[in-house]
């Protein structure tokens, strides 16, 4: 059986997150989990933490601006769901490669 569609492109991530698990306080027992992929984490870091434009952030991740926008929207939705429902957030997985080469993130390719 063959796969239909275009193969997925690797997303470029600059670094592993320092913390890969967040849990709400005041919630007894083990809360449900929301999984945030590494590319979603990187998109949120670039757009919301560093304040880059979508064009510049997309260039940094080596994806199109439309793909970046989709990744960012999905990541924000996961975080909003986790916060609204008291879920823990685990950062793992995704289709990514860690690129440690220095690059000026304000210049889009």
Regions inferred by a protein language model and the residue ranges of each:
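Short, Lys/Arg-enriched N-terminal segment that forms or immediately precedes the first helix
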Residues: 18-33
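Short helix-coil-helix linker/hinge
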Residues: 34-40
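Short alpha-helical "packing" element that flanks the helix-turn-helix/winged-helix DNA-binding module
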Residues: 43-44
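The alpha-helix within a helix-turn-helix
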Residues: 47, 58
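Helix-turn-helix DNA-binding motif, specifically the short coil turn and the N-cap/start of the second
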Residues: 53, 62-67
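DNA major-groove recognition helix of helix-turn-helix
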Residues: 72, 79
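Intrinsically disordered, low-complexity basic tails/linkers immediately adjacent to helix-turn-helix/homeobox/MYB/SANT
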Residues: 81-109
